[in-house]
């Protein structure tokens, strides 16, 4: 039985070597709260008193910083106000326009135009080409380029195949392609 008397010396524990489990309250506070902050003696005494009471109440929560960094909330509010303004003023319908052989894209607002004729004139001026005339049966004649658009389903169609209001609702982007590539899009092209 004497063999088991000296168990304290060989016991494994989480404390530092050479220290006993029983610490004074002040030492316990300084050991546990090692967060490199200066502590006033009055604060240490209050912590000791509150830990000795061991009440069932939870400690007060820290105030949560909401919306940090403030730039993000500023941007969010700014974007929301711009969205509300655009809804009231009438929303623009912007689509990208590309032309085969042109190294750049353009973006236009379809709501600025009242019909296909105005749109085609604007495209001719923008990309410096001529469209020719559109015939219901033959498509576009008299030009090497054919104006097409991609609808919401992802299909490429000739500009002028559907009524203008339907075109505005379904158009995702415009492409002025070469007539040789546009075979099969229209009736006779």
UniProtKB/Swiss-Prot annotation:
Has the keyword Amino-acid biosynthesis been applied to this entry? no
Q: Where is this motif: EAR-like (transcriptional repression)?
A: 12-16
Q: Which UniProt keywords apply?
A: Auxin signaling pathway, Nucleus, Phosphoprotein, Repressor, Transcription, Transcription regulation
GO molecular function terms here? DNA-binding transcription factor activity; identical protein binding; transcription cis-regulatory region binding
Give me the stretches of Basic and acidic residues compositional bias: 43-56
Task: Kindly provide the PTM information from the record.
Answer: Phosphorylated by phytochrome A in vitro.
Disordered: annotated span: 42-65
Q: Which BP terms from GO are recorded?
A: auxin-activated signaling pathway; response to auxin
Q: Could you say what the effect of mutating residue 69 to S is?
A: In shy2-2; gain of function. Affects auxin-related developmental processes. Affects photomorphogenesis
A single Gene Ontology CC term: nucleus
Q: Does the keyword Disulfide bond belong to this entry? A: no
Q: What residue stretches are annotated with the PB1 domain?
A: 92-179
Q: What is known of its domains?
A: The N-terminal half of the protein contains two conserved domains I and II. Domain I includes a slightly degenerated ERF-associated amphiphilic repression (EAR) motif which seems to be involved in the activity of transcriptional repression. Domain II is required for the correct degradation of the protein through the SCF-mediated ubiquitin-proteasome pathway. Interactions between Aux/IAA proteins and auxin response factors (ARFs) occur through their C-terminal dimerization domains III and IV.
The function of this protein is: Aux/IAA proteins are short-lived transcriptional factors that function as repressors of early auxin response genes at low auxin concentrations. Repression is thought to result from the interaction with auxin response factors (ARFs), proteins that bind to the auxin-responsive promoter element (AuxRE). Plays a central role in auxin regulation of root growth, in gravitropism, and in lateral root formation. Regulated by an auxin-induced protein turnover. Formation of heterodimers with ARF proteins may alter their ability to modulate early auxin response genes expression.
Q: Which proteins does it associate with, and in what oligomeric form?
A: Homodimers and heterodimers. Interacts with TPL. Interacts with TIR1, the F-box component of the Skp1-Cdc53/cullin-F-box (SCFTIR1) E3 ubiquitin ligase complex.
- The protein here is known as Auxin-responsive protein IAA3
